[in-house]
């Protein structure tokens, strides 16, 4: 008996969630959906996985996460456009499934599955869930006749007295299954056929189809259900997810995903310069980095000004921010402009277009007037004129230097995240950016953001924003101010301006999360107030 999972489809109902990767790779809690599926089956089961849309992501991930599993990958040559369909994707795997198997949709999560359906069987079965939702294909069954399926329905108006089809089928009569799928592929030309349509149209297994009703079901096939699943998931950690990146925890491994090709190569090149400050990397592929889980304490826990000062001095004394001289100054300045100015404008223009926001009138943020002349673009141009910007110092580290991405173990601080490059410069960055990111984290932390412990309200031209922060952590801002001014001769308002700039840059990265507007307006307010302080 085998397990068959199709991952070849484009996931069109999921919008931006599948813009950069496959729908089976959507993260719920600590894992992608496909891991929740595989982890419900016996470890010795043979698995067949069809690959299509971003199939290489799926293949790389499964080979890293399940090196001891017996997985056969099947390439689907046509997964989008004319002639593509779920049925065609299934048919591509026909030669590998000439025995009984379980078919499991890649957007169906069910807890405690082995206790609810058989892993070895001598009959065909279909799996359902009792719900009042009206989005699903369905069937009814006779509980007095060993749960025999009576009739199937294509998206009925009401599911009363029926069970919704969850996307799991046990195929015992596999020859009949493949015969009907091939027939459907030839005959159903008016639409893209899918598996349930075949069961319904041809009454497949009409006299030998049993129903199993599960007591839970998470459908991750649409945006609303993904959001709901993420809220309910107890097996999670606090991080703001991005649609083109992911961090998964599988056993004692941490697997980081980067959708864009080339990012991992750049990260690994940068890593050579900063490895002493980071944990050891176990392996990497084109789109993934793997390291063992580090059993340390989150740096943000119990943070206070005294511990914070110790942490800053630790990195200072270990030369994290020492100036590097092996770079052309003129080229560094060109990259600096692209990083701070051009990238910011590109991102906020996308954000403003998405939310139909203009900057052509005065606004009040937390009762502070921001005149219309102080657009983000105008403030960036003023920012460029300050001596601190002109005299930016390149250093080895360039990354997400925040407490949320830092561990403490045996008296040492371990950095978990670094950036691939500073614009086009791979191994170097601007230390003021690191200080600004730390400053950001003292106010804006993953815990409050992920638990939605923030507020934003908009009424006419008045916007109010706030986020819950730890008083002891907030108090560290004064420590940071003293540190940067004493050791690096840079003013705190300048650092604070870059913090605001970071927030407006973050806003379009989280447009599926209400935190995006908080970041935009909090960022603009911080930039404005910091600019006034710098000019005072």
Task: Label every model-predicted segment.
Residues 3, 162-244, 249:
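Conserved alpha/beta core of the MobA/IspD/sugar-nucleotide pyrophosphorylase nucleotidyltransferase superfamily
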Residues 273-277, 299-368, 372-390, 394-395, ...:
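Conserved kinase catalytic-core helix
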Residues 1-19:
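N-terminal nucleotide-binding beta1-loop-alpha1 segment
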Residues 161, 409-465:
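Active-site Asp-x-Gly
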Residues 240-268, 292-293, 299-303:
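ATP-binding glycine-rich loop module of kinase domains
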Residues 110-188:
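Conserved core of the sugar-phosphate nucleotidyltransferase
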Residues 222, 310-311, 345-359, 436-437, ...:
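Helix-rich C-terminal or lid/interface subdomains of diverse kinases
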Residues 63-64, 68-139:
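Conserved beta-loop-beta/alpha segment of the NTase-like Rossmann-fold superfamily
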């Amino acid at each position: 008996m085998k397990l068959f999972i199709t991952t070849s489809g484009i996931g069109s109902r999921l919008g931006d969630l599948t813009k950069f990767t496959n729908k089976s790779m959507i993260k719920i809690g600590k894992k992608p959906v496909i891991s929740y599926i595989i982890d419900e089956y016996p470890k010795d089961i043979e698995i067949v996985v069809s690959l299509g849309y971003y199939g290489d992501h799926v293949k790389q991930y499964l080979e890293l996460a399940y090196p001891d599993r017996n997985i056969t990958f099947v390439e689907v040559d046509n997964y989008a456009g004319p002639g593509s369909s779920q049925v065609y994707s299934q048919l591509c795997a026909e030669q590998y499934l000439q025995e009984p198997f379980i078919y499991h949709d890649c957007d169906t999560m069910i807890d405690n599955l082995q206790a609810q359906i058989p892993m070895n069987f001598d009959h065909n079965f279909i799996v359902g869930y009792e719900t009042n939702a009206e989005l699903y294909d369905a069937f009814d069954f006779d509980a007095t006749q060993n749960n025999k399926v009576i009739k199937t329905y294509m998206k009925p108006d009401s599911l009363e007295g029926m069970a919704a089809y969850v996307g799991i089928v046990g195929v015992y009569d596999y020859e009949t299954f493949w015969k009907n799928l091939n027939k459907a592929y030839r005959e159903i030309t008016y639409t893209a056929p899918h598996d349930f349509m075949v069961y319904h149209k041809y009454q497949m297994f009409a006299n030998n189809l049993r129903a199993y009703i599960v007591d839970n079901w998470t459908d991750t096939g649409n945006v609303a259900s993904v959001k709901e699943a993420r809220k309910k998931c107890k097996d999670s950690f606090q991080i703001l997810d991005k649609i083109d990146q992911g961090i998964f925890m599988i056993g004692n491994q941490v697997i980081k995903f980067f959708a864009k090709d080339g990012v991992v190569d750049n990260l690994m090149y940068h890593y050579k310069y900063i490895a002493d400050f980071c944990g050891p990397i176990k392996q990497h592929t084109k789109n993934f980095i793997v390291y063992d889980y580090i059993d340390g304490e989150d740096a943000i826990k119990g943070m206070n000004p005294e511990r914070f000062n110790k942490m800053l001095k630790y990195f200072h004394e270990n030369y994290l921010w020492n100036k590097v001289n092996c770079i052309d100054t003129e080229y560094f300045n060109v990259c600096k402009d692209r990083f701070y100015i051009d990238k910011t404008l590109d991102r906020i223009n996308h954000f403003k277009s998405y939310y139909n926001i203009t900057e052509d009138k005065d606004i009040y943020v937390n009762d502070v007037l921001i005149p219309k002349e102080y657009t983000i673009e105008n403030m960036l141009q003023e920012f460029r004129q300050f001596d601190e910007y002109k005299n930016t110092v390149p250093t080895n580290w360039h990354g997400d230097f925040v407490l949320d991405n830092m561990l403490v173990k045996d008296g040492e601080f371990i950095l978990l995240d670094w950036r691939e490059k500073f614009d086009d410069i791979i191994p170097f960055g601007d230390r003021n950016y690191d200080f600004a990111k730390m400053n950001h984290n003292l106010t804006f932390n993953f815990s409050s953001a992920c638990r939605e412990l923030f507020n934003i309200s908009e009424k006419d031209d008045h916007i109010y924003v706030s986020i819950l922060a730890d008083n002891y952590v907030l108090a560290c801002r004064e420590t940071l101010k003293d540190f940067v001014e004493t050791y690096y001769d840079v003013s705190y308002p300048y650092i604070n301006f870059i913090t605001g700039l970071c927030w407006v840059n973050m806003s379009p990265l989280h447009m599926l999360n209400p935190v995006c507007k908080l970041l935009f307006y909090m960022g603009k307010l911080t930039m404005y107030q910091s600019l006034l302080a710098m000019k005072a």
